[in-house]
């Protein structure tokens, strides 16, 4: 298993370096092929390593204490593997179309594909690192690897977006470093072997001995710092600009995986904080941040004429849902948060990829100018409707399950007024998505505009994504359910019997536990 983990980390890094040292005049097909091999290898290795951990519930380490893979990390490693591969496949025709249209010079393909693999590497590093300082560095490195992808078109708005992304995230994540160092200093005073104070798996058993005052301060900095990277309000200001200006496959990776990787770090420290100060403080903080993220994002969606900016604010709203689940707490809240990370990751990846089809067909992202997608690109229109229904959390899509469990957890544990407020916010967000369907997808195409369907190689990964988000809702894979249950126990440091005893949870996933079915 150690070899698998190291190979998983090394593969995208090595391919990125190989592409970086190739001459600029190397054929586009060489760069595209190398990147596809890179993300395909990452997918296979992630299934072999993380899939085994999810099925068994065991943990694995590499390089001593430096890298650690448990069920919590395995969920996100698989998310990176699948979405990285599908967006990598989608990138082949997408970037080629950009080059043919003149929006990207041919020699810039080298930069795109080298940074794409590097981006995958930095996210894997953030999820697999067991050293809290290295984890922070990996999250910071995701900024460095993506800032040039955001600005790759090098027009004024793209460069402004990349500059804003770099400044806001670098400044925000610095708060995360301060919180991390406070936890490290706290741990060094408590654990028997001070040289192990930076390693998460070594520190967690002693978290209940940490200084409560320092931990409250540290967790506040953690939420501000890594919440900036996750796109939580009020640190979300970089996200709409970066998502709208980046190439659509990069937007899909940013929203589908990067935001979730930052939330994983918050979940790790959330578990520490609960052990040190109890659940009330971290839950209250995340309830406030999550609720405000949902409300602000939902209201902001209506004001966006740019299709990708509207989807970007939808990402802020859904990260808010994840934070809200953590704020509600308890086994059901944590399980709902983890499921929402997975289901939203795949659904939003589909949405951003489809937005790329639409942008290439109409030559614009302006919703005022995008009308009659169903007439211009019927297959794209069908996929767009599936993505919008999925984002609206309608049955039988996966996000229906995670949001349903969120409301069950909220009604069970939280104040009823909060549940009502959040429900109103989500309704507003659904209305903003419905306007895309009614006016853009089903409207009448501009006069004289002919058919402009996306090529098959762009449609194939989108069809796979559409099938997956339906599969998650109709028959959620038992290994995923089992992994979520085990990961919930890791976050809370307690048994998940309470989760199995919840009637609504049993109604969704069956009366038998996922673990017993897997075994």
Question: Predicted regions span which residues?
Answer:
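Membrane-interface helix-boundary signature
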Residues: 1-5, 28-34, 63-73, 105-113, ...
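Cytoplasmic/organellar membrane-interface segments at the starts of transmembrane helices
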Residues: 189, 193-197, 246, 377-379, ...
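C-terminal TM-helix exit segments that contain a strictly Trp-centered aromatic cap at the helix terminus
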Residues: 43-53, 177-185, 394, 472, ...
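Alpha-helical transmembrane segments and their helix-start/interface "positive-inside/aromatic belt" motifs
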Residues: 27-39, 160-172, 377-381, 456-464
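Transmembrane helix-loop-helix hairpins at membrane boundaries of multipass inner-membrane proteins
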Residues: 1-7, 14-114, 489-490, 512
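Short phosphate-coordinating micro-motif centered on Lys-Gly-acidic
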Residues: 140
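Select subsegments of transmembrane alpha-helices in polytopic membrane proteins
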Residues: 110-113, 253-260, 458-462
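Hydrophobic transmembrane alpha-helices and their helix-loop junctions in integral membrane proteins
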Residues: 86-96, 120-133, 145-439
